[in-house]
């Protein structure tokens, strides 16, 4: 890729040189005509030009191989010194600074990553564009007295129209360059006109088609064309729009001939989940040799197969229709630089005057300053990039398809070679199996899961519209076609070495998404005919009796596992629960933990546990919580389906509900103890310690959690010292807010430590206070982590509660849950 960018930069330098040459000619012409010039403005131009030259030379150094530095730099200096006509006085001393390059090469960037190369080129391109239009006018003068009103000397006494909306000479040069790059063929002597966007291109074509057709004429479109193109066509009351029944050429031809269509619109590759394709080559061969087609128009949107077809050479025969081709050039043709909106229309030469006039009248031209931002590519660079993108997309498709068939259908049009295209684009689509998984709100969560997985894999990825970028991009796309659902669209990046990592990130993300999006609700009622269920009930009754007596009970994970299985927890969910803490969100208040929170409703009246809508979490000093954020509502990332629909988590809540049911505790102020039901805030927390960060499970020191019944469950740890995470239960007399290390030993009622998976501690929160020791590292060179579940269960709030809020008792809209209670 560095070779490609060195070639582009070489042409970029030629364009800079052309700007300097234009400036020299402009200045010479002004002198010849006796025109006044503003030296202050010119000094700004020259300062910026000097800056551009210097930055370009530095960028070129960063792109060079490690050998040959001095020779190449000396060549740069020679070229810079070659500027003349008075420029030497302004740039005096610049060559001296450049000459310092070969003695200070260590100060230059080495091994630039692709995103850095693109970012720096963008910056240089913007500066060059500014210089190119610095003195130019939108409406340059033909002649003048005393002051100049042009920059490009070709405008002086020009026979054409000096008006930027009519396309400047620079725009016409770019049009020719782009036509040569696309290699669309030579039949009908095609010409290219640049437009301000892809939709501007379609607008111009649509107006031309409407001008050529009569009231009541029919237009046939393939079963799908891009929705923003189809909608304005359908709204034309003077025309009848008919969709062909199939994407095969024969179906499209049959529809056109049956309806006597005057125009046919085709998308060779469609923006649909199936990436439906049309064999344009076969279509062209059939119609060009078929009577009645010479008077028809064929309009082709090649955006997704940019420059991939010898289109005009395929339309070769005695009955060849007029072919108009267009693209959104915001996509592939800009090499992923994303600098401007752009589009173009290609047409037979004899249609140029009519199309050009429409462009002028509608103001859809690509103006000169924007045209100068298009990268100076050629067919070699473009074909190399498109080939690389397609190869990467095919590889990603194979990797995803092999591992995700039970979750989704992954699509890429591998048959592009059969159509004699040069490439197959870089788009891969994903359609999930299962009801509801392809709804937009759910797919947005899928994108979030994939991005978080990409962060964990350390690979670059972007969520956003469009395609053809160097960095892999994901997006929830919508074809707006026959009531079809949205789908996940992946625009695969250009760096081949990243594809396997990208695949791992995408697979990890969609696995999390599928786990979280498919509701799984534990049903204790199905266990009533299993003897193990009643053995578990007897064990829990013993624990419940101890809890009612002692107000605290520690349940070892080894004891809990068969209990939870007897309640219906699935075997595979035990392992999954130990992994869920890898995917938590950032804590908004402290830097030593990641977290998720969800609100659940223990409905003892209807004997069910439900998920409720998110609400902010607040603890106050009045509830024995004394910290810097006491009384402040905290907005935590939400618990997702990967935890909520884990049957072990659901069984833990059922077990807690069974043990705490009808165990009276010291009431808290302004909670509704007349209600038989409880709210349970569930937290999934990872506390970590690493360099300069000490993980504090209870930064607030000795405290209470504003609950009636608190349960803490251990999920796992890494690199944690044996004196970490020790829980102390303190007498109510202990001072709230003091560190655990300062607590009075005589007021410590109990000491527990979670050591093994699912070790759980349940205590009456308002009858004691508690604190924990910090998380310490066993190996100080590595991060230490401690993963926990926290269940804070209380009665609903009443007006006057110290938090200043009451509970919003609403079921969750996108993550419903209804787990039966057996009590």
From Swiss-Prot:
GO terms for cellular component: cytoplasm. GO terms for biological process: terpenoid biosynthetic process; transsulfuration. Its cofactor is pyridoxal 5'-phosphate; Fe(2+). Its EC number is 4.4.1.-, 1.14.11.-. It comes from the Eukaryota. Residues 56-535 are annotated as: Pyridoxal 5'-phosphate-dependent lyase. GO terms for molecular function: carbon-sulfur lyase activity; dioxygenase activity; metal ion binding; pyridoxal phosphate binding. Pathway: Secondary metabolite biosynthesis; terpenoid biosynthesis. Gene3D superfamilies: q2cbj1_9rhob like domain (2.60.120.620), Type I PLP-dependent aspartate aminotransferase-like (Major domain) (3.40.640.10). Fe cation binds at residues 703, 705. Residues 573-823 are annotated as: Alpha-ketoglutarate-dependent oxygenase. InterPro entries: 2OG-Fe_dioxygenase, Cys/Met-Metab_PyrdxlP-dep_enz, PyrdxlP-dep_Trfase, PyrdxlP-dep_Trfase_major. Keywords: Dioxygenase, Hydroxylation, Iron, Lyase, Metal-binding, Multifunctional enzyme, Oxidoreductase, Pyridoxal phosphate. It catalyses: O-acetyl-L-homoserine + 3-methyl-2-oxobutanoate = (6S)-6-amino-3,3-dimethyl-2-oxoheptanedioate + acetate + H(+); (6S)-3,3-dimethylpiperidine-2,6-dicarboxylate + 2-oxoglutarate + AH2 + O2 + H(+) = (2S)-5,5-dimethylpiperidine-2-carboxylate + succinate + A + 2 CO2 + H2O. The modification N6-(pyridoxal phosphate)lysine is found at residue 331. The keyword Transit peptide does not apply. Bifunctional enzyme; part of the gene cluster that mediates the biosynthesis of flavunoidine, an alkaloidal terpenoid with a tetracyclic cage-like core connected to dimethylcadaverine via a C-N bond and acylated with 5,5-dimethyl-L-pipecolate. The tetracyclic core is synthesized by the terpene cyclase flvE and the cytochrome P450 monooxygenase flvD. In the N-terminal section; belongs to the trans-sulfuration enzymes family. In the C-terminal section; belongs to the iron/ascorbate-dependent oxidoreductase family. This is Bifunctional enzyme flvA. It comes from Aspergillus flavus (strain ATCC 200026 / FGSC A1120 / IAM 13836 / NRRL 3357 / JCM 12722 / SRRC 167).
């Amino acid at each position: 890729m560095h070779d490609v960018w060195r070639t582009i930069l070489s042409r970029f330098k030629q364009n800079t040189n052309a700007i300097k040459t234009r400036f020299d000619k402009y200045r010479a012409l002004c002198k010849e005509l006796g025109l006044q010039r503003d030296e202050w403005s010119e000094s700004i131009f020259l300062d910026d030009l000097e800056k551009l030259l210097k930055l370009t030379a530095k960028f070129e150094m960063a792109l060079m191989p490690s050998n040959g530095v001095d020779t190449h730099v000396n060549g740069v200096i020679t070229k810079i010194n070659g500027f003349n006509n008075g420029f030497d006085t302004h740039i005096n001393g610049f060559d001296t600074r450049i000459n310092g390059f070969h003695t200070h090469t260590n100060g230059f960037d080495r091994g630039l990553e692709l995103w850095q190369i693109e970012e720096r080129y963008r910056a240089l391109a913007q500066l060059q564009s500014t210089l190119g239009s610095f003195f130019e006018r939108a409406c340059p003068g033909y002649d003048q007295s005393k002051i100049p009103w042009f920059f490009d000397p070709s405008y002086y006494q020009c026979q054409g129209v000096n008006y930027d909306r009519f396309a400047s000479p620079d725009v016409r040069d770019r049009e020719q360059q782009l036509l040569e790059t696309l290699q669309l063929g030579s039949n009908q002597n095609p010409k290219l006109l640049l437009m301000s966007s892809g939709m501007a291109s379609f607008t111009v074509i649509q107006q031309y088609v409407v001008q050529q057709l009569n009231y009541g004429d029919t237009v046939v479109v393939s079963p799908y064309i891009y929705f923003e193109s189809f909608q304005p066509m359908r709204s034309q009351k003077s025309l009848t729009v008919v969709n062909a029944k199939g994407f095969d050429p024969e179906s499209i031809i049959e529809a056109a001939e049956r309806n006597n269509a005057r125009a046919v619109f085709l998308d060779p590759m469609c923006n649909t989940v199936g990436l439906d394709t049309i064999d344009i080559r076969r279509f062209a061969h059939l119609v060009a040799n078929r009577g009645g087609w010479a008077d028809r128009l064929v309009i082709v949107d090649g955006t997704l197969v940019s420059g991939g077809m010898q289109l005009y050479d395929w339309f070769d025969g005695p009955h060849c229709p007029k072919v108009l081709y267009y693209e959104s050039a915001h996509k592939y043709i800009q090499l992923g630089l994303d600098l401007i909106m752009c589009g173009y229309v290609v047409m037979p030469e004899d249609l140029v005057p009519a199309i050009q006039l429409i462009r002028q009248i509608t103001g859809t031209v690509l103006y000169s300053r924007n045209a100068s931002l298009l990268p100076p590519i050629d067919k070699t660079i473009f074909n190399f990039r498109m080939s690389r993108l397609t190869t990467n997309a095919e590889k990603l498709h194979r990797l995803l398809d092999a591992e995700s068939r039970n979750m989704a259908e992954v699509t890429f049009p591998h048959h592009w070679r059969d159509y004699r295209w040069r490439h197959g684009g870089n788009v891969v689509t994903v359609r999930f199996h299962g009801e509801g998984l392809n709804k937009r709100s759910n797919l947005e969560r899928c994108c979030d899961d994939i991005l978080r997985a990409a962060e964990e894999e350390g690979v670059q990825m972007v969520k956003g519209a469009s395609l053809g970028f160097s960095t892999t991009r994901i997006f929830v796309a919508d074809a707006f076609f026959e009531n079809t659902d949205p789908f996940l669209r992946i625009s695969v990046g250009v760096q081949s070495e990243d594809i396997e990592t990208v695949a791992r990130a995408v697979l990890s993300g969609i696995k999390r998404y599928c786990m979280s999006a498919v509701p799984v609700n534990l049903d204790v009622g199905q266990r009533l005919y299993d003897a193990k269920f009643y053995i578990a009930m007897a064990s829990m009754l013993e624990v419940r009796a101890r809890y009612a007596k002692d107000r605290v009970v520690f349940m070892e994970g080894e004891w809990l596992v068969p209990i939870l299985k007897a309640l219906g927890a699935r075997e595979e969910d035990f392992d999954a629960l130990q992994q869920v803490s890898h995917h938590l969100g950032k804590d908004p208040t402290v830097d030593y933990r990641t977290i998720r929170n969800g609100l659940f409703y223990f409905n003892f009246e209807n004997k069910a546990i439900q998920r409720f809508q998110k609400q902010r979490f607040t603890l106050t000093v009045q509830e024995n919580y004394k910290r810097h954020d006491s009384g402040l509502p905290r907005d935590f990332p939400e618990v997702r389906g990967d935890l909520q629909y884990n049957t072990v988590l659901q069984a833990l809540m059922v077990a807690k509900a069974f043990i705490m049911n009808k165990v009276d505790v010291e009431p808290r102020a302004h909670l509704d103890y007349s209600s038989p039901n409880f709210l349970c805030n569930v937290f999934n927390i990872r506390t970590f310690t690493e360099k300069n960060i000490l993980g504090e499970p209870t930064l607030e020191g000795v405290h209470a959690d504003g609950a009636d019944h608190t349960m803490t469950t251990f999920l796992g740890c890494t690199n944690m010292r044996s004196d970490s995470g020790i829980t102390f239960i303190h007498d109510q007399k202990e001072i709230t807010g003091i560190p655990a290390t300062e607590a009075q030993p005589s007021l410590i009622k109990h000491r527990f430590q979670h050591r093994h998976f699912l070790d759980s501690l349940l205590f009456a929160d308002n009858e004691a206070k508690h604190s924990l020791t910090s998380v310490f590292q066993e190996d100080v060179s590595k991060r230490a982590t401690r993963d926990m579940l926290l269940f804070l269960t209380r009665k609903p709030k009443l007006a006057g509660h110290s938090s200043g809020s009451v509970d919003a008792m609403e079921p969750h809209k996108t993550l419903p849950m209804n787990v039966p209670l057996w009590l």
